[in-house]
Amino acid sequence: MANQDFLNEINKRRTFAIISHPDAGKTTITEKVLLFGQAIQRAGTVKGRGSNQHAKSDWMEMEKQRGISITTSVMQFPYADCLVNLLDTPGHEDFSEDTYRTLTAVDCCLMVIDSSKGVEDRTRKLMEVTRLRDTPILTFMNKLDRDIRDPMELMDEVETELKIACSPVTWPIGCGKLFKGVYHILRDETYLYQTGQGHTIQNSRVIKGLDNPELDEAIGDDLAVQLRDELELVLGASHEFDHEAFLAGELTPVFFGTALGNFGVNHMLDGLVKWAPAPMPRQTDMREVTAAEETFTGFVFKIQANMDPKHRDRVAFLRVVSGMYDKGMKLHQVRTKKDVVISDALTFMAGDRSHVEHAYPGDIIGLHNHGTIQIGDTFTQGEMLKFTGIPNFAPELFRRIRLRDPLKQKQLLKGLVQLSEEGAVQVFRPLANNDLIVGAVGVLQFDVVVARLKGEYNVEAIYESVNVSTARWVECSNEKKLEEFKRKNEQHLALDGGDNLTYIAPTMVNLNLTRERYPDIEFHQTREH
């Protein structure tokens, strides 16, 4: 039986990620969340070049230049009686694979929507991913300090496009220059907004009760009447908050505010710690593992190279699923069947590292990795099980990487293999020639690869177009048929970074014809790590 202190530690944990379309304000909201967790004293706004106060979570050189989050940062902070683990995910179009894998390591998501735009393409894609595991979702309608779309319309759009019921928890009073604050439906309180307080925690004036004459005085008679009318309509037409439906991923509580003005973020955080689940069970190939089990298990969902420019290292991010990590404990790496002693695991505050003595289910720890750990690796205290559901996606874009200095072929290969293990890009080595082909989900990834090859491996490379339109991982239980397939299709076959056989098709037509010609061969669009 697990002891009470251990169970208390588990029940305190909340592990969540923020999902949004680029520029909906995700990095800003991350900053403000950390400010409330007292992790940083003054929030640095994400700005273009030239501003020296960069956001805490965008710490890689290229991110600083471009003002976008490229790699997933992990931050832990206390809030109310809980310990919150926040995984910041790249909102930029090109990093969906990294984002996707991060969503396998959380128990809850916060969806940030730009209220002037509504539901955007990237948000739709990410919501599809959360659907695969029915992850509970909280929603923050951002940018109330600008002119926004009608709030009822915004909620309707979320319901119809994302197929999730909305339950408003707070309701906005005006917007743009006329934004006065929000009314908290569950608390029956109005919180008034002050401008110019974005970098600190606001002490909002609170007015109790919707019929309080103080409210009319504070926001003006017209807005007060409008607020009461709107609320009558909203409460009649929207869903009441239902905790079971929220945990099942069927209903989302909706909060309104402005991350830049640091208003409304605390209401969302209050909801998160109150309603989001403590660390959830995870499925393995053998059985389900629950958080309260006493033996340690965990899985690697991301590898980050060179978190410390001073040290040429890589760090594997591991989500603790059950048991407790103790400094110096011996763990079993299931894939390699080797035991390793972990004495220097890290916790993170986006790029600042500190060594950790203990970690509990729901926590994310960093393991130093000298090329022996891969994405999807399971660590246990001896049990031979493997966590499932951490996929690799077939890339959609391909380029050939070419060296400016042909003598650096060895460094190039080393750099590309490391970047592919980290999941930044996928590398394919064709069987028929010495080309190196990289595959990505978005164009920006190629720029990142070239920049990192130069900055971290001192390799000057350029990429050029290549006649590949899609890739599929190939499997066949019949050895003889697989050998025949390989012999006849060598010019279209390659090995990926993990030496898995891959069919690289010049066109979709070619892929479909090959499929018909070889019915015994399986072509997979995703591959479990």
Swiss-Prot record:
SUPFAM superfamilies tied to this protein: EF-G C-terminal domain-like, P-loop containing nucleoside triphosphate hydrolases, Translation proteins
Keywords: Cytoplasm, GTP-binding, Nucleotide-binding, Protein biosynthesis
Location relative to the cell: Cytoplasm
Residues the record lists as binding GTP: 20-27, 88-92, 142-145
PANTHER family membership: PEPTIDE CHAIN RELEASE FACTOR RF3
Family classification: Belongs to the TRAFAC class translation factor GTPase superfamily. Classic translation factor GTPase family. PrfC subfamily.
Designated name of the protein: Peptide chain release factor 3
The organism of origin for this protein: Proteus mirabilis (strain HI4320)
